[in-house]
Amino acid sequence: MDSDLMDFFDFSKQFSRAPAPKGYITGDPTAFATETIDSKPIKRELIGKDYVHEVVEKEKHLMKKLADGYNTSKNRRTLDELDSDDDEVLMKELPSVRSDEEYYKKYRFDLNRNKNLPIYEQREDILAAIRENPVVILKGETGCGKTTQVPQYILDEAFKRREFCNIVVTQPRRIAAISIANRVCHERKWQPGTVCSYQVGLHRQSNLEDTRLLYCTTGVLLNNLVRVKTLTQYTHIILDEVHERDQDMDFLLLVVRRLLALNSRHVKVILMSATIDTREFSKYFAMSSSLPPVVTASHGRKFPLVKFYRDQLKNIHWKDEPQRTTPGIGPEGYSDAIKLLLVIDNMERKADNQSQQSYEEAKRTGAVLIFLPGIHEIDTMAEHIGRIVDENPNFKISIVRCHSLMSPDSQEEVFLPPPLGHRKVILTTNISESSITVPDVSYVIDFCLTKVLHTDTASNFSSLRLEWASKVNCRQRAGRVGRLRSGRVYRMVTKDFYMNHMNEFGIPEMLRSPLQNSVLKAKELEMGNPSEILALAMSPPNLSDIQNTVLLLKEVGALYTTVDGVYEELDGDLSFWGKIMSKFPLDVRLSRLIILGYVFNCLDEAIVIAAGMTVRSLYVTGSRGQMNEAFWMHYIFADGSGSDMIGIWRVYRIYLNMCQDRMLKESAQQWARRFNVNLRSLKEMHLMVQDLRQRCASLNIQPLPYGACHMWDDREKSIILKVIIAGAFYPNYFMRSNKANADYDRSLFQTICGNDPCRTVYFTNFEPRYMGELYTRRIKELFLEAKIPPENIDVTFQHGSEKVFVTFKPDDEDIDTTKVVQVPGRVMTEVYKAVRMRLENQNRPLRVMDQNSAFKYVEQNRIGVISDCTWVPPSNQWPVELLTLPSVFDKTIFGLITHVANCGKFYFQPQALAERIASMSEIFNRSLELSCYVQNAKAVTKGLQLLAKRGNLYQRAVVLKVETQINGYPRFRVRFIDYGDVAVVPIDKLRLMSPQLKRDFERLPPRMFECRLALVQPSSVASSYNQWPQHANEMLISVAKSGRVELEIYSLVNNVAAVLIHTRGGVLNDMLVDRQLARRADEDYMSRKDHDLRLRKQETKRNVSITDQRLINEEYLRFAQLPKDTDLEPPPLNKCNLSIRLKGPYSPLEASLNSLLRIGMYKSVYIDKESVNSVLLDSDPQDRHDQMVVAASVTEAFDNLTVRGTTLMPNIHGFGALMAMLFCPTMQIKCNKDRTKYVSILAGLGYNPDTMQPHFEEHDMVINLDVAILKDDIRIINQMRYNIDSMFYNFDVNEMPSVGTEDRVVIFNQLRSLLIRLLGKDRSFIERHVSNFEYLWEDMSDLEPPSEPYGKRAIFPMHSSYDFESENMGNLLSLQANCKELYSWRNFEGTMQPMKCRLCNDTLESVAELRLHLLTQLHRDREKQVGWKQN
């Protein structure tokens, strides 16, 4: 590699670490102060097909010149040469016939063909037409034999003449190409891979030299022809199933038509289909003097088929509604289908005596196939049928669903006979039109509807639209009946509507789907710009769609923004990334994922994810109304990553390990059923992975050799995969709903009355008069459907509230060290499960007693007390005077850390209790107490309090669970009550408590309290799953072992103290941040509120007597205690005479998404229900920064967006902004008005410097920063962008990356180092800025342009930015004065007028709000930035 280029950024320079600010993203539309013309995207003008006429006329003129000079001219192979000023066009002469005598001696040729096939009758006509015409159209019904026989007829004819013959036959599907080739080989007794062979993707049989008949997929032939730009390597090209009109087929037709006239006139082209539009294809392939002939091959049906339309069924009493013109199933549609089922049943029942077939036999062979447009309609139809069957027991129906997301086992049910005496009714989507044939279907009910995917090329958002099916679709559906007996088809539209209003054919894919791959093929063809090529398609797309596609390809780096250095809206030079993308059978963003995987040395992971994203239904889905087990399988495989794509990678890894272990077929199927994995899809994915690996190897895109450089460890890989996902799917960026509102965390805790939101959900609609504490166990049982055991749940109530609070108990450490379902952040898994329960069913019935009966019940059973007509349930609260909790007046306390689980959970014994604890220990270890041996292991149950040996002494303990026995010796897991640690203790180390000991100590609260580190949280860079890094825990353990520890109490919430630990080396909390093991974090609302109270109490401590301090502290602790679960035995159900419906459960952490794209700003965003993020919660509620979600695809319906293939990005402050800066085509980073800080980023494709209008405004993205981004960050990002470009900075003639392994290692090591530096910074917070002109590109011509090593050939050009100005001293003094004023109001006890914190741009409505605002990390950072220090 050029040393000057490698030295461009002087990478050898040593960088000193410094705290740097970070960026924050918001997609909140309210970020705009007011709505202006600039705040909404301009509607792009639709440019239609006017461009086509000029191009087609030019093409006709060219074709005429070619035809006129056909016999005398020589061939030129490019459009520019052919369309020259020369009067005479050069063409290649027709070659002489080539003999192949030796080849035909080598293989056996049996000329006896199957004469029973309908196609045989047309054999001579077909061969004659092929001999006499360059293009022949063959229309033959499904099953006539055209696919297998026509190529053999041609080959046999060549054999007779001893002429060379090379035939290629395309198939739209891989499996079809393989199976048909094998069938032909079997029929002709040829060794597979000799005379007849196949090729799908790069997978082909090894020896193709002797192949004369090749079956391949459409894409294989297309790629080959685009590469060689001639048809002459074949004598016959047979395009089968041309009616399907996918993009590959339409582009192949274009290429074949062009090359046939250009340089391959002797090649014969045969177009075949069962439902071909002969008129359209004849016109498209018409020569100047003639049209291609059409040969028709058909065969009669074995059993008759009768079709009925809605208006022809006069005897059925359905409502005489007018025919719907808008596609859809009306309120009566489902009922009408059921009426038809009843008519069919009655008809066969009446024919029982007149027919040779009995009624029971008719039901068995008379299955009904109902075509519905989607899964939702299938479920609705099933519910309607189910209700009718329940009401009419004699109407016996066996419902079978059939759609593409079903498991293979479920699909097999379609072919099984129904239960005895039942009629099978198959509810299906259009998958059964051609993919599945069920022999026993005798009736079809067709709603004549279908769902078609359309893509808006401007936004790149897809929408699944409900449309009327084409007549071709309906005929294919009708062809599903009458295999075993006569059949009937009922079309749920009128005959007039069917004949005169429904389209004959569907919309070609080129007119409704993304055009990226077609435009790339057009660029590779090198016969004109994309619009000139695509104008020649059979169905040319709108020019707007081509223009938008070119913009999208520029956005992903497949095209450069210029053509020969000049910007073109409709064209761009093909980049080296584009050349790679054109070689993959993938969406360009998935190809970009593979390229970035190569750059960041995680190529294999990227290949697996890309393959998994192309395969449908990797997971098996359940039907509506059921608790979807498959959903939790997504979580298991995602393993806490919050990423559907990483989940795919983990599924494949497990599958690959099973394959390598040679797991038996039965075992693999059991595994697939257990984890709801579609094994068939997984096998298809495996083939795709192998194919992509081969394609990468052919391009010299391979992983770095193991050991050549520093490889990513598991923790780093979890982040780097999200980095490349963010890069691949830019700009599909979404932000969780904005938390910048200062009232957010207060309302969060108010909603659940101070409970922990990370562990609590709530129901509504429970009136207090029902005395809820009586039904806590019944409420716990509601969660059994989510497999949450009742013993792990606390249910509490708030006086006067209709809410029921359900709090999940945290796992006792070490009980379950490998949780099955991991979730990101602090929120417990059970909260996700509870919210998912509500999504399945919002109402939960609960049986209760009326108030009078409830009063009688509690009086009779002496449960609680009744005072002033109010029931007071029994309480099990600890006496507050006995609690070992720090006083509200104590700022620091000394003592011992008795046990460390992690930095977020450890236990502390105050030094003041040392003598009392020693006295207790002495009592416990008296010989009298130690003589209470456990005689019967069954007496030791969960929750039992006893004595257990800890070290050399026995201490109080509570049993957590019974462990497995070893050699028949019982063991028990216990927690030591006064120390906090957990241990597994054998039965001989346990002692029961004597009655006296129970009386004295059973109600004594623990002699320690739980702590966590305050103002910090685990670094997302240093750890996964929001868990504390091991090294951080080791630092805390080291402090604990050193002896007496000084704790500074920040707050006390729910009996857990947030603390700062003072050591000789400084505050441990800060030390963890300095070592990048933790990052600074806000405390939540309850913690800040308690901290403020403690500060004010401690300021008045000297004025309060010791006695009053104790009384005030007890009142403080009493007030701080939350209600506890009473866990009462519920009343018998026969006494519960009322049924209420609880609504929920809800979580206050439920979040929504906002799109960051300008085109999606004012749209509602929903996450696909099968995504791991479909239950989207604020996983770090104390963190005022929000996380970004990246989506693989986006679909649109009206003003709603649905995102699929989602990935929750790491909770690294500024991550979204940094990723946008790193992977966007270009960006402008904007400053505040004083140019003292960066406040927002405008990213996109850039703008026209002459008009200042954006090139692709729909995809412009604004990111408002709330942490500081420094000039050094932009420098690092530019270095990374340069390195990414350097990985492919040149291609040789073979299109191989020219960077060698040694240079790749250097580049990767640089990238790795820079990325770690970029993400590892502890960034200071800044105030948010908003503007009405965020989407305006600014003229930055006054800036010196950055150096561009690769000039116009850079995929990632360098970013430029303004230097900071010095802060104005007057402004600093003003901000300091504002800060001083805020603090002057802090201890005010009355009401105040709203005040403005100018440091943070926040309005403070009350003194309480002001106090808590002063404690936020944002305000503390801003105080440092303006130089304010409190006296």
Curated annotation (Swiss-Prot):
Domain Tudor: start-end pairs: 937-1000
EC number: 3.6.4.13
Catalytic activity field: ATP + H2O = ADP + phosphate + H(+)
Example of a GO MF term: ATP hydrolysis activity
Pfam families reported in the protein's UniProt record: DEAD, HA2_C, Helicase_C, TUDOR
GO cellular component, one term: nucleus
Cystine crosslinks: none
Source taxon at top rank: Eukaryota
Protein name: Probable ATP-dependent RNA helicase spindle-E
Organism per entry: Drosophila mojavensis (Fruit fly)
